[in-house]
Amino acid sequence: MTSRLFALIPCAGTGSRSGAPMPKQYRTVAGRDMLHYSLAAFDACSEFAQTLVVIAPDDQHFDARRFGGLRFAVQRCGGASRQASVLNGLHALAGFGAHDDDWVLVHDAARPGITPALIRALVGALKDDAVGGIMALPVADTLKRVAPGTDNRIDHTEPRDGLWQAQTPQMFRIGMLRDAILRAQSDGHDLTDEASAIEWSGHAPRLVQGSLRNFKVTYPEDFDLAEAILGRGAAG
Protein backbone atom coordinates (compact mmCIF):
# COMPACT_ATOMS: atom_id res chain seq x y z
CA MET A 1 0.00 0.00 0.00
CA THR A 2 1.31 3.44 -0.92
CA SER A 3 1.97 5.66 2.09
CA ARG A 4 -0.32 8.66 2.27
CA LEU A 5 0.47 12.21 3.33
CA PHE A 6 -1.10 14.04 6.25
CA ALA A 7 -0.40 17.51 7.64
CA LEU A 8 -0.61 18.39 11.33
CA ILE A 9 -0.63 22.01 12.51
CA PRO A 10 -0.45 22.44 16.31
CA CYS A 11 -2.26 25.66 17.27
CA ALA A 12 -2.69 25.34 21.02
CA GLY A 13 0.05 27.80 22.00
CA THR A 14 -0.61 31.24 23.45
CA GLY A 15 2.20 33.09 21.64
CA SER A 16 3.19 35.03 24.76
CA ARG A 17 6.47 36.34 23.27
CA SER A 18 4.65 38.03 20.40
CA GLY A 19 3.16 40.64 22.73
CA ALA A 20 -0.31 40.14 21.25
CA PRO A 21 -3.63 40.06 23.16
CA MET A 22 -4.56 36.85 21.32
CA PRO A 23 -2.65 33.77 20.12
CA LYS A 24 -0.42 34.93 17.27
CA GLN A 25 -1.78 32.36 14.81
CA TYR A 26 -5.03 34.36 14.73
CA ARG A 27 -3.47 37.79 14.29
CA THR A 28 -4.04 39.49 10.96
CA VAL A 29 -1.07 39.53 8.57
CA ALA A 30 -1.50 41.01 5.08
CA GLY A 31 -5.27 40.89 5.44
CA ARG A 32 -5.66 37.32 6.68
CA ASP A 33 -5.26 35.33 9.89
CA MET A 34 -1.71 34.04 10.10
CA LEU A 35 -3.02 30.46 10.21
CA HIS A 36 -4.66 30.95 6.81
CA TYR A 37 -1.33 30.91 4.97
CA SER A 38 -0.31 27.48 6.26
CA LEU A 39 -3.75 26.04 5.58
CA ALA A 40 -3.75 27.48 2.06
CA ALA A 41 -0.30 26.06 1.29
CA PHE A 42 -1.31 22.53 2.25
CA ASP A 43 -4.72 22.92 0.61
CA ALA A 44 -2.92 23.65 -2.65
CA CYS A 45 -1.15 20.28 -2.36
CA SER A 46 -3.96 17.95 -3.41
CA GLU A 47 -1.79 14.90 -2.71
CA PHE A 48 -2.43 15.34 1.03
CA ALA A 49 -5.22 13.17 2.45
CA GLN A 50 -6.00 15.61 5.27
CA THR A 51 -4.69 18.63 7.17
CA LEU A 52 -5.47 18.52 10.89
CA VAL A 53 -5.39 21.64 13.06
CA VAL A 54 -4.99 20.99 16.79
CA ILE A 55 -6.35 23.75 19.02
CA ALA A 56 -6.74 24.10 22.78
CA PRO A 57 -9.97 22.69 24.27
CA ASP A 58 -10.92 26.16 25.53
CA ASP A 59 -9.85 28.11 22.42
CA GLN A 60 -12.24 31.07 22.03
CA HIS A 61 -10.55 32.64 18.99
CA PHE A 62 -10.74 29.95 16.31
CA ASP A 63 -13.50 30.59 13.75
CA ALA A 64 -13.68 28.13 10.86
CA ARG A 65 -15.61 30.67 8.80
CA ARG A 66 -12.43 32.74 8.49
CA PHE A 67 -10.85 29.91 6.50
CA GLY A 68 -13.74 29.20 4.14
CA GLY A 69 -12.94 27.20 1.03
CA LEU A 70 -9.85 25.53 2.51
CA ARG A 71 -9.73 21.79 3.14
CA PHE A 72 -8.86 20.93 6.74
CA ALA A 73 -10.23 19.43 9.96
CA VAL A 74 -10.03 20.67 13.56
CA GLN A 75 -9.64 18.80 16.84
CA ARG A 76 -9.80 20.45 20.26
CA CYS A 77 -7.15 18.19 21.71
CA GLY A 78 -4.26 20.58 22.33
CA GLY A 79 -2.04 19.80 25.30
CA ALA A 80 0.06 21.77 27.77
CA SER A 81 3.09 21.74 25.45
CA ARG A 82 3.82 21.47 21.75
CA GLN A 83 4.96 17.90 22.25
CA ALA A 84 1.68 16.99 23.95
CA SER A 85 -0.38 18.71 21.25
CA VAL A 86 1.47 16.90 18.47
CA LEU A 87 1.08 13.55 20.23
CA ASN A 88 -2.65 14.11 20.68
CA GLY A 89 -2.89 15.13 17.04
CA LEU A 90 -1.11 11.98 15.92
CA HIS A 91 -3.63 9.89 17.84
CA ALA A 92 -6.48 11.93 16.32
CA LEU A 93 -5.24 11.30 12.77
CA ALA A 94 -6.26 7.66 13.15
CA GLY A 95 -9.85 8.89 13.04
CA PHE A 96 -9.17 10.19 9.54
CA GLY A 97 -7.89 6.85 8.30
CA ALA A 98 -4.19 7.44 8.92
CA HIS A 99 -1.94 4.43 9.49
CA ASP A 100 1.43 4.09 11.20
CA ASP A 101 3.27 3.86 7.88
CA ASP A 102 1.73 7.06 6.52
CA TRP A 103 3.71 10.29 6.53
CA VAL A 104 2.85 13.29 8.67
CA LEU A 105 4.24 16.78 8.09
CA VAL A 106 4.10 18.80 11.30
CA HIS A 107 4.14 22.54 10.64
CA ASP A 108 4.19 25.66 12.82
CA ALA A 109 1.25 27.98 12.20
CA ALA A 110 3.69 30.77 13.09
CA ARG A 111 5.56 30.12 9.83
CA PRO A 112 3.15 31.71 7.35
CA GLY A 113 5.82 31.94 4.65
CA ILE A 114 5.48 28.25 3.78
CA THR A 115 4.58 27.58 0.15
CA PRO A 116 3.31 24.57 -1.83
CA ALA A 117 6.68 24.46 -3.61
CA LEU A 118 8.55 24.14 -0.30
CA ILE A 119 6.17 21.44 0.91
CA ARG A 120 6.60 19.45 -2.29
CA ALA A 121 10.37 19.85 -2.19
CA LEU A 122 10.43 18.33 1.30
CA VAL A 123 8.15 15.46 0.31
CA GLY A 124 10.17 14.79 -2.83
CA ALA A 125 13.41 14.63 -0.87
CA LEU A 126 12.10 12.38 1.91
CA LYS A 127 9.37 10.14 0.50
CA ASP A 128 11.80 7.24 0.09
CA ASP A 129 13.86 7.98 3.22
CA ALA A 130 13.95 5.38 5.98
CA VAL A 131 13.76 7.99 8.74
CA GLY A 132 12.36 11.26 7.41
CA GLY A 133 13.63 14.73 8.10
CA ILE A 134 13.00 18.42 8.37
CA MET A 135 13.21 21.66 6.49
CA ALA A 136 16.18 23.70 7.72
CA LEU A 137 18.69 26.40 6.82
CA PRO A 138 22.48 26.44 7.31
CA VAL A 139 23.39 28.96 10.01
CA ALA A 140 24.79 32.11 8.40
CA ASP A 141 25.35 34.33 11.44
CA THR A 142 28.23 34.14 13.91
CA LEU A 143 27.01 32.54 17.15
CA LYS A 144 28.12 33.73 20.59
CA ARG A 145 27.81 31.71 23.81
CA VAL A 146 26.94 33.82 26.87
CA ALA A 147 28.91 33.19 30.04
CA PRO A 148 26.68 31.93 32.89
CA GLY A 149 25.91 34.42 35.63
CA THR A 150 26.97 37.49 33.64
CA ASP A 151 25.05 40.43 32.18
CA ASN A 152 25.15 38.88 28.71
CA ARG A 153 28.93 38.79 28.45
CA ILE A 154 30.38 36.61 25.69
CA ASP A 155 32.04 33.44 26.92
CA HIS A 156 33.14 32.23 23.50
CA THR A 157 32.23 32.03 19.83
CA GLU A 158 30.55 28.83 18.65
CA PRO A 159 31.84 27.32 15.40
CA ARG A 160 28.98 27.43 12.92
CA ASP A 161 30.34 24.77 10.58
CA GLY A 162 27.73 22.06 10.26
CA LEU A 163 25.07 24.00 12.19
CA TRP A 164 21.59 24.31 10.71
CA GLN A 165 18.54 26.20 11.94
CA ALA A 166 15.52 23.92 12.19
CA GLN A 167 12.32 24.94 10.44
CA THR A 168 9.08 23.17 9.67
CA PRO A 169 7.46 21.17 8.17
CA GLN A 170 9.07 18.17 9.84
CA MET A 171 8.20 14.93 8.06
CA PHE A 172 8.17 11.49 9.67
CA ARG A 173 6.18 8.27 9.65
CA ILE A 174 3.21 8.61 11.99
CA GLY A 175 4.02 5.48 13.98
CA MET A 176 7.71 6.26 14.31
CA LEU A 177 7.03 9.81 15.50
CA ARG A 178 4.31 8.78 17.94
CA ASP A 179 6.49 6.10 19.50
CA ALA A 180 9.47 8.47 19.67
CA ILE A 181 7.44 11.12 21.50
CA LEU A 182 6.05 8.53 23.92
CA ARG A 183 9.59 7.32 24.62
CA ALA A 184 10.81 10.87 25.23
CA GLN A 185 7.89 11.51 27.57
CA SER A 186 8.57 8.36 29.55
CA ASP A 187 12.17 9.50 29.94
CA GLY A 188 10.99 12.87 31.29
CA HIS A 189 11.84 14.98 28.26
CA ASP A 190 9.61 17.71 26.80
CA LEU A 191 11.19 18.37 23.42
CA THR A 192 10.63 21.47 21.29
CA ASP A 193 10.45 19.83 17.88
CA GLU A 194 9.66 16.48 16.33
CA ALA A 195 13.18 15.81 15.05
CA SER A 196 14.46 15.93 18.64
CA ALA A 197 12.16 13.05 19.55
CA ILE A 198 13.35 11.04 16.55
CA GLU A 199 16.96 11.78 17.50
CA TRP A 200 16.23 10.69 21.08
CA SER A 201 15.13 7.35 19.64
CA GLY A 202 18.51 6.87 18.01
CA HIS A 203 17.67 7.89 14.45
CA ALA A 204 19.28 10.59 12.29
CA PRO A 205 16.73 12.76 10.45
CA ARG A 206 17.77 14.31 7.16
CA LEU A 207 18.04 18.07 6.62
CA VAL A 208 16.39 19.54 3.53
CA GLN A 209 17.22 23.10 2.44
CA GLY A 210 14.43 25.50 3.36
CA SER A 211 13.89 29.20 2.73
CA LEU A 212 14.39 32.45 4.62
CA ARG A 213 10.75 33.36 3.90
CA ASN A 214 9.71 30.38 6.04
CA PHE A 215 10.85 32.08 9.26
CA LYS A 216 9.00 31.77 12.56
CA VAL A 217 7.01 34.81 13.67
CA THR A 218 7.97 35.10 17.34
CA TYR A 219 8.51 38.70 18.46
CA PRO A 220 6.41 41.85 17.83
CA GLU A 221 8.76 43.17 15.13
CA ASP A 222 8.45 39.89 13.20
CA PHE A 223 4.91 40.79 12.17
CA ASP A 224 6.16 43.69 10.06
CA LEU A 225 8.53 41.37 8.20
CA ALA A 226 5.79 38.79 7.65
CA GLU A 227 3.49 41.56 6.43
CA ALA A 228 6.10 42.68 3.91
CA ILE A 229 6.74 39.17 2.59
CA LEU A 230 3.13 38.03 2.40
CA GLY A 231 1.78 41.37 1.25
CA ARG A 232 4.26 41.42 -1.61
CA GLY A 233 3.12 37.94 -2.63
CA ALA A 234 -0.52 39.02 -2.61
CA ALA A 235 0.30 42.07 -4.69
CA GLY A 236 2.14 39.93 -7.22
From Swiss-Prot:
Pfam families associated with the record: IspD
UniProt-listed SUPFAM superfamilies: Nucleotide-diphospho-sugar transferases
HAMAP family (UniProt xref): IspD (MF_00108)
Disulfide pattern: none
Entry superkingdom: Bacteria
GO BP annotation list: isopentenyl diphosphate biosynthetic process, methylerythritol 4-phosphate pathway
Transmembrane regions: none
Matches recorded under Gene3D superfamilies: Spore Coat Polysaccharide Biosynthesis Protein SpsA, Chain A
GO molecular function terms listed in the Swiss-Prot or TrEMBL record: 2-C-methyl-D-erythritol 4-phosphate cytidylyltransferase activity
UniProt KW Nucleotidyltransferase keyword: yes
Reaction equations catalysed: 2-C-methyl-D-erythritol 4-phosphate + CTP + H(+) = 4-CDP-2-C-methyl-D-erythritol + diphosphate
Keyword Methyltransferase belongs to the record: no
Principal EC category: transferase
Record NCBIfam families: ispD
Record PANTHER family: 2-C-METHYL-D-ERYTHRITOL 4-PHOSPHATE CYTIDYLYLTRANSFERASE, CHLOROPLASTIC (PTHR32125:SF4)
Annotated pathway: Isoprenoid biosynthesis; isopentenyl diphosphate biosynthesis via DXP pathway; isopentenyl diphosphate from 1-deoxy-D-xylulose 5-phosphate: step 2/6
Function: Catalyzes the formation of 4-diphosphocytidyl-2-C-methyl-D-erythritol from CTP and 2-C-methyl-D-erythritol 4-phosphate (MEP).
Residues annotated as site: Transition state stabilizer: 17, 24
Keywords assigned: Isoprene biosynthesis, Nucleotidyltransferase, Transferase
Annotated site location: Positions MEP for the nucleophilic attack: 160, 216
CDD domains from the UniProt entry: CDP-ME_synthetase
Protein family (similarity comment): Belongs to the IspD/TarI cytidylyltransferase family. IspD subfamily.
Assigned EC number: 2.7.7.60
Protein name as annotated: 2-C-methyl-D-erythritol 4-phosphate cytidylyltransferase
Coiled coil: none
